[in-house]
Regions:
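Catalytic pocket-lining loop regions of alpha/beta-barrel enzymes
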Residues: 26-27, 37-139
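Flexible, active-site-proximal loop/turn residues at the rims of small-molecule/cofactor binding pockets
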Residues: 34, 116, 144
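Conserved, mostly hydrophobic/aromatic
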Residues: 20, 28, 51, 90, ...
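Mid-domain alpha/beta scaffold segments of enzyme catalytic cores
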Residues: 1-46, 110-111, 150, 177
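Residue-level "edge-of-site" marker
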Residues: 33, 63, 169
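Short glycine-enriched loops at secondary-structure junctions
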Residues: 7-10, 63-64, 93, 145-146
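Mid-to-C-terminal alpha-helical segments outside catalytic/metal-binding sites
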Residues: 15-19, 23, 135-139, 150-182
Length: 182
């Protein structure tokens, strides 16, 4: 299972998204910090429009060092594109956790993944977020693996989840969201 990427400056965005679909990829990954655009940049509106109701969008979110990917920038996007399925990488806001929680609280079409975040987010805080917003809104490692799977699984296990929560986070949520069978 993979995701494709596009850039808002492309002159062929519609064709780019159609290529992602025709290749059998299951969503679009955007990294505002590396690709040098803000989540709410007007140039991204066409991407969100093309993906709404068709492809989940995995967004690099957070990092207090940059303003491109602050989860607060999602607010107008999630208000406009209510059918857009947005996954905030790094628990929705690496190093700006409260902003991610605000988005989870306000928008049912926003969920998070665990990649490259559980080393910095305490197991207690991760568990609090999972219990507050539901395990159905958390997915394991849909983004780039900074650490080994073994290390990431150990971090998941340190959260003391129920068996149902663990299964949902590790694979059931991704299977449902990205449309593959178990």
């Amino acid at each position: 299972m993979g995701l494709g990427t596009v850039h808002p400056d492309s002159d062929t965005l519609k064709e780019d998204v159609e290529s992602i679909i025709s290749l059998g990829l299951r969503g679009v990954k955007l990294h505002p910090d590396f690709q040098r655009f803000k989540i709410d940049d007007y140039r991204c509106l066409k991407i969100y429009e093309l993906c709404e109701g068709r492809l989940p969008v995995l967004l690099h979110c957070g990092d207090h060092r940059f303003d491109f990917s602050n989860p607060n920038r999602l607010r107008p996007i999630l208000e406009i594109f209510t059918g857009l399925d947005v996954i905030g990488a790094h628990f929705g806001g690496w190093s700006v956790w409260q902003e991610a929680e605000d988005m989870l609280s306000e928008f049912s079409n926003f969920s998070v993944d665990t990649s490259s975040s559980l080393y910095a987010l305490s197991p207690e805080k991760a568990k609090e977020i999972i219990r507050r917003f539901g395990a159905s809104r958390v997915m394991f490692a849909t983004d780039y693996p900074m650490w080994s799977i073994r290390e990431e699984l150990a971090r998941i296990d340190s959260i003391s989840l129920t068996a149902d929560e663990r299964e949902a986070i590790l694979y059931k949520n991704a299977a449902k969201r990205f449309g593959f069978s178990l």
